[in-house]
Amino acid sequence: NLATAHNSSATKQNAQQLADALGIRLNNGAITQLVEASRDVLCNEYGYDDSKWPSLVMENIQARIRGHLLSSFAAIHGGVVVNNGNKVEVALGYCTLYGDAIGVLSPIGDCTKCDLFALSKQINELYEKEVIPWNLLPEVSDKIEWETPPSAELKNDQLDPMKWFYHDQLLDDLLSGMDPCEYLRAYQSKELFAGKYGFWLKLYGLDDPQEFVKDFCWFTSTLRRNAFKQLQTPPILSLSSKPFGTIPVIQGHAVYPQCEKLLKEITEA
């Protein structure tokens, strides 16, 4: 366990519980000293003022220190590092190069977060015990409830920016060839609310046209901006016809230029 100063007690307990359930050794440690040493070198040796840094600088330092330690552990034991990013995180670049993006194989890189929720439940049922802590899995009824919300825990009160379930489905459909303009037209006509997206659109407040457009633009532009991370993901164990590594990608900032008129119409409706 490579604990940061921001790790919750629940996270530490979950790590111990999982190790116990699988019968594997857990080594507990903290990366705080290395993080502070990195800050000191940048400030005292190179003259940077950490009060002027965006928070992402220290978040990435923590992730890269973890990557460094994992690589060192692997070298000591004659092993390798396995990547733990899921498909949505890879798509949106929600990882740090040379940090949590390292590894020789990405076994779950073709699984969305929702796939992993379902797989975790199947594992618990198969083993007839709590292997994957239940507090990590959401309860979905007329709402979604998290006992332990997904978080990188690299700063205080940090939560994942993704709208889980909705963004998982949107990514799957876009990668499977869904026409984004047809998707927007279905939203305009309200047809989208009658299908698989309806529940999640309402749950996340995306029945508000302005919020919908804001989220769609964020998602699609983030997807395009992070092509360079998608290309540098370790080899992915393919479970679908469209895993990253087999998809031609384009680095850019544009939000599907062919959809700009539709997005404007939805916003002004």
Predicted region positions:
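ATP/NTP-dependent adenylation/nucleotidyl-transfer catalytic domains that generate, transfer
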Residues: 1-269
